[in-house]
């Protein structure tokens, strides 16, 4: 009997070792945490069915109360029986997967035992189904509460399952005396082994899941602590100053060798190891970062070659690079570097991903706040334009002069002035208007300007018929046309032409305003739309405001694009196509 106990202990040990190895694989951890899902149920069924079949074929042959052999068996003599760990696998399948898993595993286990044969082999098919039902329905009770059976309860059910098998051997045996002799020999070792094995199996699962839960709790705490300390910085945007403050906090609180943050083209900050050549304000030098910006997906590197730094003395050997997203576009990257590859763990990767998500949200919130401010600024400027004494008095004086000369034209201009004020007010209160309404606004403005300066400029429209209902931000064309009138022609009084072009395809609207003026100075061209540029006729703040609004609403693809030569300037932008019908 003691020899049987030792041999069974070996079989149980094999199953437990395999279970321990599986529970260290992330896929199986996830499966155990989602065991109520159908996909997990089928995976558990296949896993425990393989365990059950293995248990049957690695059993210990017993005949006339003696151990005959412990080799792998495919067939038994008609008078022989077998001691194995089959009941353990069926019971565990039920406790973990519930009745669905247990019944299928029980049938598979019973049929494979029936195939091996031996004395009263059909008995084990019957007992397998009973054991599956009992353990399966108890497992179902715990699944409904999203818990697992305790180790003690597992040990009790394990012993009970083996006791049921002993009872089935006695009840369904053809030779009661032989059955009783068999039960006397195998009952105690098998009940003890099944009870102990079930308890250990459950303890491995429970301890692994508890450790996983504790790890997640620590990660969550770390993420919240870092997020809480970095919260104020990214709300102001992805700048060198905000990036450096955030990187220093992360380096202090996390087990990493270096932290870097970039925008799409440049290193904003790099603190920690390798700071001598990973320098802020310089272009991105690692191939890994360039790949993340290109694909928008997290990337890992586990060697210097994979990082792609061209400095031979770089001490960085491992890295995690996560994209920072704004409105589903890559705005930059968050990079964790390691001088020891073993520090680059799965938990660090998950923590990095969580931080990147939070930082991306903060950047989006910051941009939304900036857009709100820009819209308010645009509204204020628009309202100011309505009561701008210079513009207002010039228009009124022009109309007054025309009253005596051409009263009908004066009446039309007065209506245009009213239309201009009304359109300005409506545009200031809406995020988008149709291209048709924007053109009406432009016409009203041009009518007033042409009345003041007859024949000074000519406006030519090239508008696709499908464009009229496409939605655009207010004042886009008006600002571009007004900019051309004020800055393009300087003191030239004739042959001044402005072309307004709108082209529409299925995905985007292309707006272009082109003039034949004197062009923009080469030293000022890169600054136009990026910042205020002082000149004799203004500061260019309207173009800067418009450009920032377009980028904030639609991304960098919608930014104003300037081309200028000595024979004219072309300003264009590409806006995603949305019609008024789609927005209603």
From Swiss-Prot:
It comes from the Bacteria. The keyword Transcription regulation does not apply. It catalyses: ATP + protein L-histidine = ADP + protein N-phospho-L-histidine. GO terms for cellular component: plasma membrane. Its main location: membrane. Residues 379-461 form the Histidine kinase domain. The chain crosses the membrane at residues 2-22, 42-62, 87-107, 114-134, 152-172, 185-205. Keywords: ATP-binding, Cell membrane, Kinase, Membrane, Nucleotide-binding, Phosphoprotein, Transferase, Transmembrane, Transmembrane helix, Two-component regulatory system. GO terms for biological process: cell wall organization. InterPro entries: Bact_2-comp_sensor_kinase (IPR050640), GAF (IPR003018), GAF-like_dom_sf (IPR029016), HATPase_C_sf (IPR036890), Sig_transdc_His_kin_internal (IPR010559), Sig_transdc_His_kinase_LytS_TM (IPR011620). The modification Phosphohistidine is found at residue 390. The keyword Ribonucleoprotein does not apply. GO terms for molecular function: ATP binding; phosphorelay sensor kinase activity. Its EC number is 2.7.13.3. It is found in: Cell membrane. SMART domains: GAF, HATPase_c. It is a multi-pass membrane protein. Pfam families: 5TM-5TMR_LYT, HATPase_c, His_kinase. SUPFAM superfamilies: ATPase domain of HSP90 chaperone/DNA topoisomerase II/histidine kinase (SSF55874). Member of the two-component regulatory system LytR/LytS that probably regulates genes involved in cell wall metabolism. This is Sensor protein LytS. It comes from Staphylococcus haemolyticus (strain JCSC1435). The gene is lytS.
